[in-house]
């Protein structure tokens, strides 16, 4: 028999701090629940247990508190954000069929110890999952500790059995109690012996074995005089620490074999709760796909749906959605995706032909869920999908941009949508009408109708057309560039080997590189990780003046260009010679667009080699690329929203904003501003929007933290409206729970009310940045819609084909290039009217590099 015992509080705590705060649409925290269940799922796969117990601490004092008033006296209270999740987590565990165990006056550690001892007595295998190293004392021939640790912000488990304990500590597991009794434990406020740390305690235990033996051999020459004095003075504390640190194995709990068998629980309730918590992916991970969620009695339908064939001549209003595909083992399709239409209480399963026909039927209007694949189908068939008048997925994104996914089942639960009818084959169909109505009402209530109707909804059609059109690339040019990069890599590698003095060296190995640079060569080093010295870009940039480091940075840059961009782009070129990137409209919390397959947002431009890549994105014969880029749009928006006269004056006069800023700060004439001063002003102009403090600014501009702080204070004194605006934005967001763009786009910020300083500071940075960056995103989206419509309305052959950050690219016949440039400038600059007018830089070329 194999028993898995999970230290509930410890793993929940670990999950809470490893995952950034997540909230549902209605503001419930979920990161600890999500992380805990993910860790648990991994443990279940790893251990394949026959029984599972989850141990939790109770709020009552334990026998250790009665023994020592100061026990755990230095611990902070559980954060409210975590405390709110604990009862929900326990409810979910019960619904999933996992038994929880607690004992008044006892800690979860003692429950782990008691269950481990019971397994040992039966010679059964026991796995203890915890983040508390105290449990390592329980390791035995039958007991393995799965120690939860954090690495790079992620939780993982380290398997600690007898061999691992011997290798890591060189002592027996039980002797870890002796070590703790000597060194104490600040986290539990266990005193130990004054002046004895882990290294000394380990030495004493390795030599004498036990605490008793240490005191029996105080005259040993191994024990130094000062240590002897401290041992004598702290004898009582040492033995108290021994008692406090010993995990008991006699807690009053059920230890019978079979007591922790996983039961059926209440799977429908578990599915419903997971949907409410918007952690839909866990439904699949726990094998709950296909289980109909428990329904609120108030939402139970009274009628059954009629399933019928679509009329030969459909008319009126339909709701259209897809039953998602169900995947089995190894991603085998158990049930394919199936689109359907709903009208009143009738469900119409749709063939591909019927679906496409419906999308452009002038006699019907469609409220759909996820218009992107529908527009793609319509455009592939030669139409525009003009029957679509509303998209529930876009509405869901607008109402909660922080969600990790948007699924009908989750949304129906979250909105407590009432089902108009029951339909076993299409279980979500009955909820569509009520769900869509509630989402429409909330958009209106939030004042987001114009944002939805004028920007988000029409943009979906624009993006679908851009994806379908794609951008032409020069395949042979990219292949030749790849050859050039590989030759460059060979040359740089040869130089690296010469400079390193060895060919037995892998520049891709951070460990080998760290050893060479910081141990062998003795260069100034940064932080050290468990795998060796850090060799990240920030560390190496400080050493760029050294030829070897310069070449390593060059090697990394060329390697990334070749693997990520050259090889990556060649894989996704279509049969038409064009790349059809997919634009993601519902991912970024600020409202920004992203793209994938491939990601064209990150095509490098800051290096000479990187910028060359743009030369291989070309116009088709007889055409040119017309590129329009907003000039400093975020700073212009900042000047508008803050009403800062100095910043507005600089923009209105056409001055260089960064030179003007430097002149104001240093009280000098603009013509006296040096490149270094301008660079510093540029860094703070942008840094202020991202909430950067003196430390970050000091790294950006290469000065001390003290100098950066003085620079920052001078800036804020020079532009007082900016600081006042930022502070008011944070205060307002803390009160109402969200920030808004000028178009009314909301972003919830529960982080602002966190008790954790780091989380709260992160929320403040987002509060500063989101209204500016989000407004810029709204502006570029609106401009895209206007440009796309204008090109169509004027019946031009020119096509909007790409957007990257604040940049729009049109592929235009040479005869239309001037007109296309005019349209780009007029629509991009005229889509909003702010105190500081928007400005664009428009250029034309045969390829992207020429046009930019």
Regions found by a protein language model. Give the residues of each.
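Function-dense linear segments that define catalytic or interfacial modules
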Residues: 345, 393-422, 431, 585-670
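Active-site-proximal helix-loop-helix substrate-binding element of RNase H-like nuclease domains
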Residues: 99, 152-180, 332-463, 487, ...
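C-terminal polymerase-core module
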Residues: 487, 491-494, 498, 502-549, ...
């Amino acid at each position: 028999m194999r028993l898995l015992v999970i230290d509930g509080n410890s793993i929940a705590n670990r999950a809470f701090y490893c995952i950034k705060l997540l909230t549902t649409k209605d503001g419930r925290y979920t990161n600890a629940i999500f992380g805990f269940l993910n860790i648990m799922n991994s443990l279940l796969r790893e251990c394949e247990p026959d029984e599972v117990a989850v141990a939790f601490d109770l709020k009552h004092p334990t026998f250790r508190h009665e023994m020592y008033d100061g026990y755990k006296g230095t611990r902070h209270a559980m954060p409210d954000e975590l405390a709110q999740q604990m009862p929900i987590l326990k409810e979910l565990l019960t619904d999933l069929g996992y038994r929880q165990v607690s004992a008044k006056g006892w800690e979860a550690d003692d429950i782990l110890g008691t269950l481990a001892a019971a397994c040992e007595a039966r010679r059964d295998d026991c796995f203890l999952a915890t983040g508390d190293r105290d449990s390592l004392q329980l390791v035995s021939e039958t007991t393995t500790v799965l120690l939860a640790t954090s690495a790079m912000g992620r939780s993982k488990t380290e398997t600690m059995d007898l061999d691992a304990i011997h290798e890591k500590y060189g002592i027996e597991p039980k002797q870890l109690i002796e070590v703790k009794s000597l060194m104490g434990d600040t986290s539990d406020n266990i005193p130990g012996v004054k002046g004895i740390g882990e290294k000394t305690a380990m030495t004493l235990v390795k030599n004498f074995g036990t605490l008793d033996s240490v005191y029996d051999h105080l005259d040993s020459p191994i024990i130094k005089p000062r240590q002897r004095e401290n041992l004598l003075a702290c004898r009582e504390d040492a033995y108290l620490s021994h008692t406090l640190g010993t995990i008991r194995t006699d807690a009053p709990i059920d230890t019978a074999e079979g007591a922790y068998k996983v039961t059926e629980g209440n799977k429908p309730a578990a599915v419903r709760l997971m949907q409410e918590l918007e952690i839909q992916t866990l439904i699949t991970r726990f094998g709950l796909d296909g289980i109909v969620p428990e329904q609120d009695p108030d939402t139970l339908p009274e009628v059954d749906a009629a399933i019928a064939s679509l009329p030969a001549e459909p008319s009126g209003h339909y709701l259209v959605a897809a039953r998602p595909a169900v995947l089995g083992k190894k991603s085998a399709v158990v049930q394919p995706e199936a689109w359907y239409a709903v009208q009143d209480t009738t469900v119409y399963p749709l063939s591909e032909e019927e679906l496409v026909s419906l999308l452009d039927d002038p006699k019907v209007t469609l409220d759909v869920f996820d218009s992107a694949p529908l527009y793609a189908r319509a455009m592939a068939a030669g139409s525009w999908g003009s029957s679509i008048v509303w998209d529930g997925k876009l509405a869901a994104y607008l109402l909660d941009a922080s969600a990790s996914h948007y699924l009908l089942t989750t949304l129906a639960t979250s909105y407590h949508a009432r089902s108009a009818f029951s339909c076993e084959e299409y279980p979500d169909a009955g909820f569509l009408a009520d769900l869509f109505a509630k989402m429409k009402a909330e958009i209106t209530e939030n004042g987001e109708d114009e944002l939805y109707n004028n920007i988000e909804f029409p943009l979906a059609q624009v993006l679908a057309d851009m994806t379908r059109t794609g951008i032409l690339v020069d395949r042979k040019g990219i292949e030749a560039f790849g050859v050039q990069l590989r030759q460059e890599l060979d040359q740089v590698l040869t130089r690296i080997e010469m400079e390193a003095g060895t060919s037995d060296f892998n520049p891709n190995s951070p460990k080998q590189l760290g050893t060479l640079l910081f141990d062998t060569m003795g260069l100034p080093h940064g932080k050290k990780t468990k795998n060796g010295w850090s060799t990240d870009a920030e560390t190496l940039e400080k050493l760029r003046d050294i030829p070897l480091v310069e070449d390593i940075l060059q090697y990394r840059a060329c390697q990334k260009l070749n693997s990520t961009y050259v090889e990556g782009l060649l894989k996704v070129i279509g049969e038409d010679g064009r790349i059809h990137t997919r634009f993601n409209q519902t991912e970024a919390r600020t409202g920004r667009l992203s793209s994938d397959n491939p990601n064209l947002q990150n095509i490098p431009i800051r290096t000479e080699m990187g910028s060359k890549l743009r030369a291989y994105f070309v116009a088709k014969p007889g055409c040119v690329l017309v590129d329009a880029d907003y000039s400093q749009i975020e700073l212009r928006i900042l000047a508008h929203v803050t009403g800062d006269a100095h910043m507005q004056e600089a923009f209105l006069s056409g001055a260089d904003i960064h030179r003007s800023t430097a002149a104001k700060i240093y009280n000098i004439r603009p013509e006296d501003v040096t490149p270094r001063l301008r660079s510093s002003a540029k860094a703070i102009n942008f840094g202020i929007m991202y909430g950067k403090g003196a430390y970050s600014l000091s790294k950006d501009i290469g000065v001390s933290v003290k100098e950066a702080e003085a620079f920052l204070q001078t800036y804020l004194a020079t532009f007082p409206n900016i600081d006042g605006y930022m502070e008011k934005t944070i205060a307002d967001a803390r009160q109402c729970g969200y920030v808004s763009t000028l178009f009314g786009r909301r972003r919830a910020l529960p982080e602002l009310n966190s008790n954790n300083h780091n989380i709260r500071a992160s929320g403040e940075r987002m509060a500063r940045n989101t209204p500016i960056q989000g407004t810029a995103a709204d502006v570029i989206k609106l401009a895209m819609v206007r440009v796309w419509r204008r090109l169509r309305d004027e019946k031009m052959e020119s096509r909007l084909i790409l957007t990257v950050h604040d940049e729009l690219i049109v592929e235009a016949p040479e005869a239309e290039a001037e007109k296309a440039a005019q349209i780009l400038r007029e629509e991009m600059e005229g889509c909003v009217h702010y105190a500081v007018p928007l400005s664009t830089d428009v250029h034309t070329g045969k390829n992207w590099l020429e046009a930019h």
